């Protein structure tokens, strides 16, 4: 659904992104991780074309967005929804008006605008808070509104830039559950930028590690975990699984943390 090929972003002679290749299918959540300064924020701005790449291509549903002129690009960018770290809601607008804002800019008819806003607020569990202002909402509630706004133009790709940063564990879990549900229901490709490995373990299908502007390791999460003893594998599983021989040819796999999903143990033990 989104294909990034040889993406490079330079400021002067300094390459902040250097030959990024990334493909995310419809219905897939791809996590991008990396230390501060690795280029994650620049990659996010290039994906939604707030920054123009120096070289390389970004294709959404087969259309090369990097070749488009200004007017065509404005249209094509509707295919990419964005959820920001702190929701980015306008304080003087209600929850419903924040969600409706992109539709107003496009002069979407009132009836269709009301239908989309009502449907999305209901889907994210915030219909009963439609008339509330951001200051009246909790951090998790604001992020739910941000998710609804990111989806209101019915995008093919959702860019979620640190959507759980600063949220408590319970709220984080609820936002990730909602994100996964929306991914399944709407069949969108999700690019999830995060520094939290718990988030990757909980919801991502694939993961790519960015360092000094390059992807140094990537793959399906389960394969990365059971692959080589790499920094990314160790970060995803801080304490490696312990194995003890209990009988000839029979091995027992144990893991000493309670928060590891049962499906992970099954995948790692194959």
Where in the sequence are the language-model features?
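Catalytic Walker B motif of ABC-type/P-loop ATPase nucleotide-binding domains
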Residues: 158-161
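ABC ATPase NBD coupling module
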Residues: 65-81, 105-110, 224-228
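ABC ATPase "signature
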Residues: 218-219, 227
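Helix-to-loop junction immediately C-terminal to a conserved catalytic motif
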Residues: 48
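Conserved ABC ATPase "signature" region
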Residues: 63-64, 100, 104, 111-128
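Conserved signature/switch motifs of ABC ATPase nucleotide-binding domains
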Residues: 132-135, 152-153
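The feature captures the beta-strand-to-loop junction immediately N-terminal to the Walker
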Residues: 33-35
């Amino acid at each position: 659904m989104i294909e990034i090929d040889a993406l490079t972003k330079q400021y002067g002679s300094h390459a902040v992104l250097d030959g990024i290749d990334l493909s995310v299918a419809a219905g897939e959540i791809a996590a991008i991780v990396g230390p501060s300064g690795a280029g994650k924020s620049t990659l996010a701005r290039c994906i939604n074309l707030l920054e123009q790449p120096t070289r390389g291509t970004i294709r959404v549903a087969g259309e090369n967005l990097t070749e488009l002129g200004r007017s065509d690009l404005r249209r094509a960018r509707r295919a990419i929804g964005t959820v920001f770290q702190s929701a980015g809601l306008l304080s003087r607008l209600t929850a419903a008006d924040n969600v409706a804002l992109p539709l107003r800019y496009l002069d979407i008819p009132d009836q269709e605008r009301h239908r989309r806003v009502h449907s999305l607020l209901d889907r994210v569990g915030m219909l009963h808070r439609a008339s509330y202002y951001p200051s009246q909402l909790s951090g998790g509630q604001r992020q739910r509104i941000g998710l609804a706004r990111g989806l209101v133009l019915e995008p093919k790709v959702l860019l979620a830039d640190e959507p759980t940063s600063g949220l408590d564990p319970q709220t984080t879990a609820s936002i990730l559950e909602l994100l996964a549900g929306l991914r399944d229901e709407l069949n969108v490709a999700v690019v999830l930028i995060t520094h939290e490995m718990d988030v990757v373990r909980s919801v991502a299908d694939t993961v790519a590690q960015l360092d000094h502007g390059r992807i140094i390791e990537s793959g399906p999460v389960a394969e990365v975990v059971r692959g080589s003893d790499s920094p990314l594998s160790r970060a995803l599983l801080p304490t490696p699984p312990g194995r003890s021989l209990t009988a000839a040819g029979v091995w027992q796999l144990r893991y000493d943390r309670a928060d590891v999903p049962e499906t992970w143990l099954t995948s790692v033990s194959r």
